[in-house]
Amino acid sequence: LTTGENTPVAVGDVLNASLAAGTAATLYSSATGTSGVSCTSSAFTATVTANPAAPGTASESLTGHTFDTGGCTSNVVGVLGVSGITVDNLPYTTAVSSDGTITVTPAAGSAVQTTVRLRTLLGTITCVYQAPALTGTASNADNSIAFTKQHFTRSSGTSLCFSDGYFTAKYAPVTDTSLPGGPVVHVG
């Protein structure tokens, strides 16, 4: 991970990114469908824990991953709206390879978990989704991190909670907020 003219990002620096302009984070009920939840405001925060020279693999501690539910909608039949989305079991470990491959893993014995609260005519329901890990891609073209159709399974919730969730989101630009001006971060 570097900033500017190949300056290595320091261990302990805090990285941040929001959704790429004009995009949405989605959790759809199938890999090919468009039924589910969509949010236009989301962000993540991570702290760099290791940053060896390329071709090494950098490590980060993902300490925050938020969704502004004011920008979230759902088109699931029977659902009136989204009252909350929480990413649980933080922090996660994020490994960033010099080729741009990203792997997000939870603590041992845990899971990547998201709790979605949906408003229905019968009240608010809680849907919990889990995945063993997530895989994404970092790109220097726009200093982005993207996740595409990452598969979650429902671990609890009523029948209104779809049984599978496929998460897609693109965050850009990733910046180093520990440095003046928050320069963008490059991989490799």
What are these regions (language model features)?
Residues 1-61, 66, 151-188:
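N-terminal segment immediately downstream of the Sec signal-peptide cleavage site
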Residues 137-144, 149-151, 157:
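Intrinsically disordered, low-complexity, charge-dense segments enriched in Lys/Arg
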Residues 15, 88, 98, 141-142, ...:
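Intrinsic-disorder/low-complexity regions
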Residues 11, 16-21, 101-115, 143-149:
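Generic recognition of long tandem-repeat/solenoid scaffolds
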Residues 87, 122-124, 147, 162, ...:
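Alpha-helical structural elements
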Residues 1, 5, 112-113, 118, ...:
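A detector of low-complexity, intrinsically disordered, Ser/Thr/Gly/Pro/Ala-rich segments
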Residues 32-140:
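Predominantly extracellular/secreted and cell-surface proteins with exposed
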